[in-house]
Amino acid sequence: MDATIAPHRIPPEMPQYGEENHIFELMQNMLEQLLIHQPEDPIPFMIQHLHRDNDNVPRIVILGPPASGKTTIAMWLCKHLNSSLLTLENLILNEFSYTATEARRLYLQRKTVPSALLVQLIQERLAEEDCIKQGWILDGIPETREQALRIQTLGITPRHVIVLSAPDTVLIERNLGKRIDPQTGEIYHTTFDWPPESEIQNRLMVPEDISELETAQKLLEYHRNIVRVIPSYPKILKVISADQPCVDVFYQALTYVQSNHRTNAPFTPRVLLLGPVGSGKSLQAALLAQKYRLVNVCCGQLLKEAVADRTTFGELIQPFFEKEMAVPDSLLMKVLSQRLDQQDCIQKGWVLHGVPRDLDQAHLLNRLGYNPNRVFFLNVPFDSIMERLTLRRIDPVTGERYHLMYKPPPTMEIQARLLQNPKDAEEQVKLKMDLFYRNSADLEQLYGSAITLNGDQDPYTVFEYIESGIINPLPKKIP
């Protein structure tokens, strides 16, 4: 980029590189850590931070009333995410920590640990290698606003906070059937989650303090504290109903912790819409262009415009149009490159449809540097496609378009003169759909982070799903 020439134009490769490698988020995380820890020499600190490479490890807090299942969900998440579980019990059982020994002594006397001591235990545990490299999950901590503020003061910030919720009557009834395996720490229930193995059944123990009165007292204290804890975690907190099967709660929690929060990183949408003929790609592209000022790039329309304008490429394309043959990929990509390299596409972003039709075209797009950052597959059943396309008609006198089911002509006279576009004939539609589905599996494999949508619903409902997929960051893929 020549510094002596104005106005400056940023090459499209620069923002694309920054976006793909999360440069903005990396710099933001380093700045946050610098402000939190305030090291005397920032350079070695930043180098150490980069070596850790732990910006995206799980940092999760799970809160909830007694018997809501938070410990079970926390243990399942730990196994799935390979993270460290931090509970009050395992924090005070650390035999190599003087702080833990003192906390254990106080806990045996008072059945509670002072907030300052508990937060010190958490700080010591989070400084260990497994928590730094693999992440952590706090189970039932913080319990009070004081604990939440002390944790925040030390710069310990979770990425996701989950609060489980259920009616008190359900929790009291559930707590009465609670059983614990003393060997593994696994929690079972006499009604909802009874182990099939007789060996485990025989060693299960009834925990203390699960009577109806004691549970009600704990619930009262929880409700008094949680309303003051929740405001400490705006924008990163999700409430999940615990009054449903444990597996459903787990999958909702897992989906949430795999999601990424919206950032202030600059983002230029490069949207690719894929789907069979008649799936609504053109309509969705027009809606996106209208609302977000994206450049609507329709491959077929570009080719027609090139022919109509009698450009150099248009003259090469015209013979293929006249013979009703497919335009070669090399020529098609040159026309497409010419459009996507224009400044409006670089600055505003684009929504592309009509290409790629197969894996070769997709690889060509990638090699040319036109990598979409959002890909959507619009799935529509075969019968719905046939209904949408084969019943379309046009009035040759007025040019008005009709649909025999959704927008029938007002009079018999108009209906008698309606014509069908040859492209909407049943055989033509079947051929196009067959061609798409032959290549769709390869395209789905190539675009692994693509979002699949049900296109057989109201167009504005589909648009809302697409809009949500563009605005929100893509979820993390955790094996």
Swiss-Prot record:
One cellular component term from this protein's GO annotations in UniProt: sperm flagellum
EC main group: transferase
Stretches the record annotates as Adenylate kinase 2: 269-471
Annotated residues for binding of AMP 1: 140-143, 147, 203
Residues that coordinate or bind AMP 2: 325-327, 354-357, 361
Glycosyltransferase listed as a keyword: no
Keyword Kinase: yes
Highest taxon of source: Eukaryota
Positions of the UniProt region annotated as LID 2: 391-424
Binding site for ATP 1: 67-72
EC number of this enzyme: 2.7.4.3, 2.7.4.6
Binding-site positions, ATP 2: 278-283, 392
Cysteine pairs bridged by disulfides in the record: none
Localization: Cytoplasm, Cytosol; Cytoplasm, Cytoskeleton, Cilium axoneme
Single GO MF annotation: (d)CMP kinase activity
GO biological process: ventricular system development
Principal subcellular localisation of the protein: cytoplasm
Region of interest (LID 1), ranges: 177-206
Keywords assigned: ATP-binding, Cell projection, Cytoplasm, Cytoskeleton, Kinase, Nucleotide-binding, Transferase
Region called NMP 1, residue ranges: 87-113
InterPro entries with a match to the protein in the record: Adenylat/UMP-CMP_kin, ADK_active_lid_dom_sf, P-loop_NTPase
Job of this protein: Nucleoside monophosphate (NMP) kinase that catalyzes the reversible transfer of the terminal phosphate group between nucleoside triphosphates and monophosphates. Has highest activity toward AMP, and weaker activity toward dAMP, CMP and dCMP. Also displays broad nucleoside diphosphate kinase activity.
Record-stated family: Belongs to the adenylate kinase family.
Protein name listed in UniProt: Adenylate kinase 8
Species name: Homo sapiens (Human)
